[in-house]
A protein has these predicted regions:
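Cleavable N-terminal export/targeting peptides
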Residues: 1-28, 193
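Short glycine/proline- and aromatic-enriched beta-strand/turn motifs that initiate or cap beta-hairpins
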Residues: 20-71, 75, 185, 189-193
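Outer-membrane pore/translocation modules
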Residues: 23-50, 101, 105, 115, ...
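Residues that define the transmembrane beta-barrel architecture of outer-membrane proteins
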Residues: 27-31, 48-54, 85-93, 109, ...
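Membrane-spanning beta-strand positions in outer-membrane beta-barrel proteins
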Residues: 30, 67-69, 110-112, 156, ...
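Extracellular loop and loop/strand-boundary signature of outer-membrane beta-barrel proteins
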Residues: 41-44, 79-86, 133-139, 171-175
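Gram-negative (and chloroplast) outer-membrane scaffold detector with strong preference
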Residues: 57-132, 190-193
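Predominantly the C-terminal beta-signal and adjacent terminal strand-loop region
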Residues: 75-77, 147-193
Length: 193
C-alpha cells in the first residue's frame, strides 16, 4: 500500500507540470556582447550616413526581472563629403536601468524598456584636421555626454545563454556632429552566476 501511494505521488508530480529553471533572480549577473547598425543599414557606400556599433555590457538583475546595466560601446557613423565620407566615432561608457514590462511564466522571453546615462569621447576623421582635398575641419574631437532610451528583448536558449535584440535612441551633447543616433542590433548574453 505504501509503495503504491509513493508511485502515485511520483506519477502525479511528473505529469502535473514541468519545472522551469529559475531565471532573472536578484543578484544574478550576465555578460552581453552586442553588435548592430546605427542610423540606418550600413552598406559601405561613401554616400551613406549609416554606421555600425559594438558593445560589451554587464547586467545585474533585481526583483521582478528588472536589471541594472553597465557597459561600453563603440559606434561609428559616416558623414558624406564630396566623393568620400568622414568617419565619426563615439566611444562611450554607460549605466542604466531596464524595467521588465512583459514576460512569459517560465521567463524564457522577456521584454524591457530602459534608460541610461552615458559619457565618452567623439572623434571626427580620426583627429586629422585636413581633408584629402585640403579643406580643414573645425572640430576633430570632443567629450560627449547624454543618455539613451531603449526597447530590448531577451530570449533564453538555455539557462546560461540568451539571444538579445534591441532598439536604442542615443542623445548626446558636447559635439557638433549631431545629437541623435538610432541603433538596432542583436547580441548574446552569458549568465555568469
Amino acid at each position: 500500500m505504501k509503495r503504491r501511494n509513493i508511485a502515485i505521488v511520483a506519477v502525479l508530480a511528473l505529469s502535473v507540470g514541468q519545472a522551469f529553471a529559475q531565471r532573472c533572480l536578484p543578484q544574478m549577473k550576465g555578460i552581453e556582447v552586442k553588435v548592430g547598425m546605427a542610423d540606418g543599414v550600413y552598406d559601405g557606400k561613401k554616400s551613406s550616413k549609416a554606421g555600425y556599433y559594438a558593445g560589451l555590457g554587464l547586467s545585474s538583475y533585481t526583483k521582478g526581472g528588472d536589471k541594472w546595466t553597465y557597459g561600453a560601446e563603440y559606434m561609428q557613423v559616416h558623414q558624406p563629403y564630396r566623393d568620400t565620407s568622414v568617419p565619426i566615432a563615439q566611444m562611450t561608457g554607460e549605466f542604466g536601468y531596464a524595467h521588465n514590462f512583459l514576460s512569459d511564466n517560465s521567463k524564457t522571453v522577456l521584454f524591457y524598456i530602459g534608460g541610461s546615462a552615458m559619457a565618452g569621447y567623439e572623434s571626427m576623421n580620426w583627429g586629422k584636421r585636413t581633408m584629402s582635398d585640403g579643406a580643414t575641419l573645425q572640430n576633430t574631437g570632443a567629450f560627449i555626454y547624454g543618455g539613451s532610451v531603449s526597447l530590448e528583448t531577451e530570449i533564453y536558449l538555455s539557462d546560461a545563454l540568451a539571444l538579445t535584440a534591441s532598439v536604442k535612441e542615443r542623445f548626446v551633447w558636447g559635439n557638433s556632429t549631431g545629437h541623435f543616433h538610432t541603433q538596432f542590433g542583436i547580441g548574446m548574453k552569458f549568465i555568469i552566476n
